[in-house]
Each structure stands twice: as C-alpha cells, then as structure tokens.
Amino acid sequence: QSGANKYAVDVDFENYIFDWDNIKEDYRDEYTEQQAKAVADLVYACGAAMYAQYGSATSINNYAKMLYGLQHNLHISKNARYLRRQHYSTAEWIEMLNTQLRAGHPVFYRGTWLFDGTEAGHMFVIDGLDSEGKYHVNFGHSGSGDKFADINVLNQSGTKPGGRGVCYNATQAMVINCYPTPEYTDYPLQRCI
C-alpha cells in the first residue's frame, strides 16, 4: 500500500529527562536495552524539538523551524543564526566557522551533492579543527566516514550503494552560536541537550 501519513508529537521539554549516563559513544557494538532507550529518547526529543519530518529513508525540516526549535524548545541562544555560504567571501566564512570552534561551539553544517542530476542535502556537525586547517566532521551514519576534511570539499567516502562517496561541497550553510541561553548554562544535565 502506498500513501503518506502525518502525525504530530507533543513533548514537554521543560520536564523531559535525558539519561546521559546510559548514552554510549558508539552503538556499533553490544548495548543494553536501557542504553538503546536512552539514545532513542534523545533522538526522539531532538527530532520533535526541531520539527523534523521523517520518511522511509530520510528526514527533512525547514531551517526556520529548526532554528525556532533550537531556541524555543532546547534553550539555544537567541543569537543562533542560519547562514548561507554564498553570501560571504571564503575568508569571512572560514573566520566565522573558526570563531565558533575556538569558542567551543559545535556547528550544524549543511551541504549538498549532485547525483544523477539530482541535488541531495545532508546536515552534520563540525566540531573541531586540526593544525592543517581541516575540520572534524561528524557526518552521522554511526560514525561511518567521520573525518577531518577540507571545508571546500567535505567528502565522505563509502556512504552510498556500491561504496560510492559523496562531496557535500554545494549549497553550504551553517547554524552558528549554538550554545545554551544564560539561564540554562547551570541547568541540571539530565534536562539539557
């Protein structure tokens, strides 16, 4: 049967408790039912907070809704901004990205790649910079392909059928200033994302 179903979820973020002690760094090996539930609850809350829409093979969201969700549901700074690379020089873009990383802020990053004439986008996290000027990229995908990469290429190897890699070097954008609002910096860890 084909078709589509949509339903909304309600999450009380003020009282949502995260079981950080049972969230593993890596789920590719064995894990307990409690560890599976802990990470599932976190992913569920993040998706709900940012108004993600899920399909059979992907999830999508509107960037304005994502930013609203980060700020209003997850108490991320009202200074958070969604920026498109095309509006900045390379030097300006690199300086903004480096400023975030020097401040200890992870950066939500978006890139697209072309495959058979179709553009496909992906969002991931940049959370480090090495001495050669390459950025540490967490592409998702259970750690598959995570690496230090050139920001102008952002290639992830072996993630598509047949082991093909992709380069997220088109339509780049990022969310900057992702840090807790001041009133939540000392909030109990179990209630923070």
Explain the meaning of each model-derived region.
Residues 32, 36, 43-46, 60, ...:
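Generic detector of bulky aromatic hydrophobic side chains
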Residues 1-85:
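Cysteine-nucleophile protease catalytic domains, especially the papain-like/related folds used
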Residues 102, 116-120, 129-193:
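Cys-His-centered catalytic/binding microenvironment captured across papain-like cysteine peptidases
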Residues 68, 72-138:
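Active-site-adjacent substructure of cysteine-protease-like catalytic cores
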Residues 44, 52, 66, 125, ...:
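Generic detector of intrinsically disordered, low-complexity, polar/charged segments
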Residues 36-57, 96-103, 159-174:
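Short, Φ-rich (hydrophobic/aromatic) sequence segments
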